[in-house]
Structures are given as C-alpha cells and as structure tokens.
A protein has these predicted regions:
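His/Asp/Glu-rich, glycine-adjacent segments
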Residues: 29-139
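Beta-strand elements within well-structured catalytic alpha/beta cores of enzymes
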Residues: 1-7, 40, 113-118, 157-164, ...
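Segments forming glycine/polar-rich beta-alpha architectures that bind adenosine-containing cofactors
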Residues: 1-30, 35
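Alpha-helix capping and helix-loop boundary segments enriched in small/acidic/polar residues
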Residues: 24-31, 61, 65, 144-151
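Short alpha-helical segments and helix-capping/turn motifs at coil-helix boundaries
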Residues: 9, 23-26, 97-103, 156-158
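Composition- and surface-driven signal marking solvent-exposed, interaction-prone regions
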Residues: 7-13, 129-131, 174
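Active-site-proximal structural scaffolding
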Residues: 3-7, 33, 67, 98, ...
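A long, amphipathic alpha-helix that forms part
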Residues: 133-171
Length: 174
C-alpha cells in the first residue's frame, strides 16, 4: 500500500542523506499486500508460490495471516539461486520494534541482505477505511500524504535511514 505520492513525500526527507535512482516497475494484480509482498520476497508469482511451497501459502479464504512466512519466502529465493547470502528479516509494526533495529544496526551490517518491512503505511491505509477518526484526519489525498510525511519525520524509521546513510549502504524502497 505504499503509494508513489507517499514516496515523493518521504523522499523529500531523505534527499540530504541519499542519492536516488528511481526505477519504475509493473506490479502484479491484485496489488494486495498478501500477494505483492510474498511475490517480491519469493521471486515468484502467487500461483507459483502455492504450487512450489504449499506449506508457505495461505489461501484467501483461510483465517490465518497471509504474510506470516515472508522470511521463509526470502530464504526459498536465495536457495533457488544457490546463493550463500546471509540475511535478516524484521517486520516493524511499532516504534519500539523500529528502535530495536536501530540499536542493532551494527550487528546487521555483517549480513549480505537485511529486509525490513515497515508496516505503518499498510496499517494507515487499513485504518483509513476502518477508523472514523483516521478518515477525518486523512479526509483527502493531501492530508493523507501529510500524515505519512509527519509520521516519517517523527518516527524511529527516520533515524534508521539516517544511520543507513552514515554507513553508506544501498537501500531499496518499495
């Protein structure tokens, strides 16, 4: 649910720290998180995931979470390409989890790949449809972008990006 207009707002905050190379890609349909993120992490289309890794795929009609196997899907992609990359995976659902990653950043630099899912924007999108208060706060697109930018400026995720910039690492935002 990370939209291009939200990226444009956040990229303004990052402009002093990073050099951007933007590449536009096509997306799979549907773009729902459970399909898109699982496809990115596995390097496969949803049907391929369900066929090749049925134990990692959760069907639409099942109650359990659809994105609970993202770290395993990353591992399957690394294994399929016969790579020996070390990686970490964190899903950041709140400020405390984000702060913990900032504190551990030195240890993570030894990995070939670090995957961080920042769930705030997804949660904001869902809250926008489910919560009357959030609908009022983000009653139009300009307000929605403003909330996104304000959150980023004031969140530990901003500090995480600053630390990544200081360490001169490549960051991919999607």
């Amino acid at each position: 649910n990370f939209r291009y207009d939200q990226w444009r707002e956040i990229s303004k905050e990052l402009a002093d720290d990073f050099v951007f190379e933007e590449r536009f890609c096509l997306s799979i349909l549907p773009t729902a998180t459970q399909y898109a993120r699982n496809a990115i992490f596995s390097g496969l289309m949803p049907m391929q995931i369900s066929q090749m890794y049925p134990d990692l795929w959760v069907d639409e009609d099942e109650e359990e979470g659809k994105n609970l196997n993202e770290d395993y899907l990353i591992k399957t992609q690394i294994d399929r390409y016969r790579r020996k990359d070390t990686f970490s995976y964190f899903k950041l659902n709140n400020s405390v989890e984000s702060e913990k990653v900032v504190d551990r950043i030195g240890n993570l630099m030894g990995n070939d790949l670090n995957v961080l899912v920042v769930n705030f924007i997804d949660m904001l999108s869902h809250a926008r449809t489910e919560s009357r208060m959030v609908r009022e706060l983000a009653n139009d697109e300009k307000a929605y972008r403003s909330i996104t930018a304000s959150w980023f400026r004031n969140s530990p995720v901003r500090e995480l990006f600053r630390e990544l910039a200081r360490r001169d690492v490549k960051v991919v935002v999607t």
